Amino acid sequence: MSASENAPVIEIRDLTKVYRMGEVEVHALKGVNLTVERGEFVAIMGPSGSGKSTLMNIIGCLDRPTAGTYRLDGIDVSRLDRDQRAEIRNDKIGFVFQSFNLLARTRATENVELPLLYGNLGLTAPERATRSREALTRVGLAGREDHYPSQLSGGQQQRVAIARALVTDPAILLADEPTGNLDSRTSEEVIGIFQDLNDAGKTVVLITHEPDIAAHAKRVVYVRDGLVWRDEKIVQARAKHPDAAAATPGGEAEPAVAFPFTIATPEEVVR
């Protein structure tokens, strides 16, 4: 499936999602409009129940809307069936999850190769291995390709997950709370990888409830009550954190993050 290089990578219009439980209807999304251009780094925020997880599932082709349109990389995926959405997912989206989702008895390089097997790309085993090792090198894991997950730290396991998401060269990286299981220092290092990938031209969509993590993006979309409540550029994205050097004693303090608006906490939103 081909797409126009001039088309936005994500184009959502009047998107609604209604869940029906017996006679009860729950309106999770109520007419969302959202455009993400190629090469953007967008953080989507919102408290529990805001609709951000539903929006993520639709962006990731894990679910489809009740009404409205969603074009991914120029392709209208709004009404595709499950098998068609699976094909689009494998081709267009690289997922990174909070829980890493690595196969415990499989080496790092083999974990990264999995999407190449599912994608039916026709690659030989040596070609898959080469692409896997290149992806691991790209996220700073050269020399650890043959390690099992149990031999890697949490941050290193998440790097493997990012490499796995990258290996098919997807249109977007979709990261769902990728630092949720990491300490603050390791979180900074992992988010720095996303910044590096974005600087190299990769489109990144990050789902998070943490303002400190969203501050690394270049744009923040805040979802509330099933609608896009705020959609603003960040004046100055938070600086990358090379090896967490700024957190070490004697290191320079990081500059304050300049938001063009105040990001409300979940507690403030639900009041």
Language-model regions, residue ranges each:
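ABC-family P-loop ATPase nucleotide-binding domain
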Residues: M1-V18, K233-R271
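H-loop (His-switch) and adjacent beta-strand-loop-beta switch element
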Residues: V220-K233
